[in-house]
Amino acid sequence: MSLKHFIQITKPGIIFGNVLSVAGGFFLASKGNIDFGVFLAAVIGTSLVVASGCVFNNCIDRDIDQRMERTRNRVLVQGLVSLKLALLYATLLGIAGVALLYTEANPLAALFAVIGFVIYVGFYSLYLKRRSVHGTLVGSLSGAMPPVIGYCAVSNSFDFAALTLLVMFSLWQMPHSYAIAIFRFNDYRAAKIPVLPVQRGILVTKRHILLYILAFLVATLMLTVGGYAGLNYLAVAAGMGMYWLYMAWKGYKAVDDTVWARKLFVFSIFTITALSVMMSVDFQVTKELLVTYAF
């Protein structure tokens, strides 16, 4: 047991991805008027809650992880950290994260962190992941919470922009997750996890991927339509979304589904990263703020 093991069970890669989306939502709402104290609270608080959820997920999935090639060497599967200690660690991380968001950001940001945690750990990890093909859809809601937390940490309100972020990031999660399920098909089948490719076949999954990316593309444009993001954001969102849609369409002619799914997965990360960056720098400033800056 070492510090490295405690870091590994928090899934740092997932935390880093969520930090980018928190920042995107935060800077979108800030419109150039940045409170760095609140920003750090939003980023650190959300990271702690996400880390807590990941540790709980590792605890819950020990039996599944033993059957999957890519997860059989995880810390808890190997017994490098005890289950009791991991549960305590996860609990402390979660409490610290929610407390930080509540006290240094606002109660609304903390509420969305709790909602995301409950969906991920309670509904997805404990139940739906093992029992329903719709587990991915429900789990996608938890993955969409970080940008909403970042946005609400500034705005302290759930408005059209916050709703758009929730819908947009939820829709993004679906083809992203389905791509993983395709190139990790044998692992999911061995672990008896009822993901869409295993339950209904890869061809059906390709159709779902195409439809979700199309819906995602439309949702991303709503930030500009609603007057929250600028034309540069719109251009990047449209360009990335259409190319991702084109890649999904090419899947119908793919010779090797595993290779195609990996490419789709990698591009999904580029897409959401680009949009998080663009909404951070190309926000729409209201007329009232422009007058304030002018004087």
Curated annotation (Swiss-Prot):
- Which UniProt keywords are present, listed alphabetically? Cell inner membrane, Cell membrane, Heme biosynthesis, Membrane, Transferase, Transmembrane, Transmembrane helix
Q: Report the Pfam families cross-referenced here.
A: UbiA
Spell out the molecular function terms from Gene Ontology: protoheme IX farnesyltransferase activity
| Metal-binding listed as a keyword | no
Which EC class is the enzyme in? transferase
Which topology term describes how it sits in the membrane?
Answer: Multi-pass membrane protein
Source organism's superkingdom? Bacteria
Q: Which family does it belong to?
A: Belongs to the UbiA prenyltransferase family. Protoheme IX farnesyltransferase subfamily.
Official protein name in the record: Protoheme IX farnesyltransferase
Gene name of this polypeptide: cyoE
